[in-house]
Amino acid sequence: MPDEDLQDILSQISRDNIESTIRKLVSFGTRHTLSSQTDPVRGVGAARTWLTAKFQEAADESEGKMTVDWNSFIKYPGDNERIIFPVNITTIVATLKGSEDPDRYYLTGGHYDSRNSNPIDYQGDAPGAVDDASGVAVSLELARIFAHYKPKSTIVFTAFAGEEQGLLGAQNLAQTYKNASVNLAAMINLDMVGNSKAEDGTTDPHNIRLFCQGTPLTENATTMTSRLSIGGDNDSPARNLGRFIYEVASNVWTEMTVRVIYRLDRYSRGGDHRPFLEAGYTGVRFVQPNEDYTQQHQNVTVRNGKQYGDLTQWLDFEYNTRAAKVVATTMWSLANAPASPTNVGINTTMSDNFSQFKWDAPKGLPVEGYEILYRETIEPHWTNVIDVGNVTWYNLTSATIHKDNVIFGVRSVGKGGYKSPAVLPFPFGCARNC
């Protein structure tokens, strides 16, 4: 059951606010990256100005805990056919400082730019209602609500720019964080979370997909070889983050089930989580359960009696609100748990029926204990939990829970029962009583 603060947060998520934000973003006509940055009513500049003011309204209610900044740079033509003249790319970043572990960050957000059928048409209408005003609306609504609370770790709410031109805003922010050695523990991308209907009319209003990369994109050859040798390719940080989100956010409070997809993204598609993965961070992407491709990246037109275009009329605002509850639960649960244990290992130097684990306590929030999780290798989610207390090693002496037959994970447990994502143990060699 969510704690009292989280229950209160969930009760405040407003369908009307989410709808209002989406309609306002659509009203700018186009939010194409190359569109006007000076017109006060049309184009990406007008959208940026309005969004910045709305995030600042949230910050003004935070008693100084939240700050709003721009992460900006100039993108020049040359290596990107979708950039045909120099353009300013500005991501809006609202940072809510953690009350106890402010150096550990969790980030969520969507992209506020849009496009139509032609990726360099910066003058034609590109309403971008689902893609991705729906995700930005969630980020803004959660910033508004969370500003009144004190999560223990830092939460960042973003509106990315330049996504449709090649994930440009996310790439720059990820590199900015990497250059500053920011401890970003997870990035949660919200890209198309506003409609549950497919092109054939199929609807799935209580499910949301979560795309989770396998073997990390930046993993070195030695670690990758070890991961593959122990069958750990399905237990990357991103996939264990996905299991965490499934566990905390699939419930009656959100009225949703998180459907974890073991892929980086959909076929031939990309999202703002990828640059964070490429920078060495853990990132995942929420996407609605079904898609209608007559509504994505389409000119607003009618052909053979059928309406095309990413219009507000296709939105299911109740679904969008439930998606916001999933994200709120995810961010609150991550930010109030201790960090995951580090240097998690399992002794494989001897052929025996015992499983000997060791790990290091994480920095930041105090840990009240640890749990060893396990599941059959064919199971998608954790099925069993062993509470091992507040120790940094454990000998599992059960011959029926054999390390050759299951996948293990170790997670931290903190105050209030908040738990970290699990970590896959890698093989190590040590003395019997290490």
UniProtKB/Swiss-Prot annotation:
Residues annotated to bind Zn(2+) 2: 131, 164
A Pfam family of this chain: Peptidase_M28
GO biological-process terms attached to the record: proteolysis
Sugar-bearing residue positions: 88, 179, 220, 299, 347, 353, 390, 395
Keywords associated with the record: Glycoprotein, Hydrolase, Metal-binding, Metalloprotease, Protease, Secreted, Signal, Zinc
Binding site for Zn(2+) 1: 111, 131, 191
UniProt-listed InterPro entries: FN3_dom, FN3_sf, Ig-like_fold, M28_fam, Peptidase_M28
Cellular component terms per the entry's GO annotation: extracellular region
Cofactor, how bound (note): Binds 2 Zn(2+) ions per subunit.
Residues annotated as domain Fibronectin type-III: 340-433
Cofactor: Zn(2+)
Highest taxon listed in the record's lineage: Eukaryota
UniProt cross-references to CDD domains, sorted A to Z: FN3, M28_like
GO molecular function: metal ion binding; metalloexopeptidase activity
UniProt subcellular location: Secreted
E.C. no: 3.4.-.-
Major localization listed first in the record, in broad terms: secreted
Family: Belongs to the peptidase M28 family. M28B subfamily.
Name assigned to this protein: Probable zinc metalloprotease PTRG_04772
Annotated organism of origin: Pyrenophora tritici-repentis (strain Pt-1C-BFP) (Wheat tan spot fungus)
Record lineage: Eukaryota, Fungi, Dikarya, Ascomycota, Pezizomycotina
